[in-house]
Amino acid sequence: MAVGADPWHPSPMPEPEPELRCDPAEGLRPFAELGPRRADEPRPGSLEILAEDLASAARSCRLWTAHGPVETPCFMPVGTYGAVKGVLPEELRAVGSQIVLANAYHLSHRPGPERVREVGGIHAFMRWPGPALTDSGGYQVFSLRSLQKIDDSGVDYRTHFDGAPARMTPRSVLEAEAAIGPDICMILDHCPPGESDRAAVREAMDRTTRWAREAASLRREILHEDQLCFGIVQGGTDLDLRREHLESLAGLDFDGFALGGLSVGEPVPAMHATLEAIAPLMPRDKPRYVMGIGTAADLLAAIRAGVDMFDCVIPSRHARNGQLISFLGRFNIRNGRFRRDDRPVDPGCACPVCARFSRSYLRHLHVHNDPLYVRLATMHNLYFFHEWVAVQRRAIRRGDYAAVAAGLEKVLGARTQPGSAAAAEV
């Protein structure tokens, strides 16, 4: 026995390190088995709360749609025009995608909602047999320099590609989404810029309330019976306005609720504080969605606050711009240091890209503008985002979320700490 050891009071065993990696596609239906809801499955809109964390608001659910279940928390890749650029539908599933987001504004102008309807809806059009969601495109319209007029009944604007005059209303958005045919339809809302003052935020919030009431009264008339419709809560980072708006929408005929108007230029701490304060107040029996957030830190904050769904263009847009995201940090693959680096992007990553291709090869493809680069880089980035979320989903269901969340916080710290090995590589 070692000198000084006490056999009656042995030192406690160190806590095992939490599992921070997983296959995000594990447990999901294979691509070949995706398709319309089976007769014995719950009706679209049914939400099963499978587990809730005792130390935070984090939860894991199963949302049923007309094209099968969505296991939450869930990250949704953005396929604005009906495709995630460069990636085949079956490849989306292979890296862990469950539900794809498209944009009703863009699809309404090109190729047009009736054209999408003619071929059988968005699922047949893009050959994606799993769940799909469409955003109204209101955010894109309000971002246009050619915006002509906003009033309480809708928005007049000129299209971004040919300058033709157009109008968007709560009714026109639902009519387009009925033709496009997603499983989840987002209503028209007014999203003000992040730097807006309180008066402007309230004006946008009140207008969104009027549009939400109109959409809720029309949805049963316009949308198909198995399409879900989500309301959108505005209010910026003003917690009083957010609470007020949530209360005004909670009783309307919606199948789920989203927090809009975040990640639009406001300080990140204010955004996270808004998530922490408001997400747990959203109806417990309906899915909770935060629109347009997508850094690893944002997703960790959202899941801890009880959010079920989120989307962002970061995985695909950053990939196209040469940014590869991993548990080690973010790589600028154009950097000359990767010219002779034959390691995978992340040796601990099990994605199809890291299993086969090196940093040097990906750099070579990117420098020469080879389309294969976009495909591979997007697949890798999506895998990271899905894995980051799936690890937390598994932990909530296992009951060890606190330990896993703490482990992921350490990962974030290691990725950003100056002088660290990870930071030196990226």
Regions found by a protein language model. Give the residues of each.
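Compositionally biased, low-complexity flexible segments
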Residues: V3-P7
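C-terminal extensions of enzymes
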Residues: W8, P14-W64, V70-C74, G86, ...
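Non-catalytic, usually N-terminal nucleic-acid engagement modules in DNA/RNA processing proteins
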Residues: P14-L223, G336-R339
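Glycine-rich phosphate/ribose-binding loops and adjacent secondary-structure elements
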Residues: L20-R21, E26, E33, T209, ...
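Glycine- and acidic
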Residues: P193-E195, R202, G256-L262, P371-V374
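Active-site pocket-lining/capping segments in soluble small-molecule metabolic enzymes
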Residues: W128, L133-T134, G138-R145, D151-D162, ...
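Flexible, glycine/charged-enriched surface loops at secondary-structure junctions
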Residues: E221-D226, R398-A402
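Conserved, mostly hydrophobic/aromatic
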Residues: G68, V100, D135, E177, ...
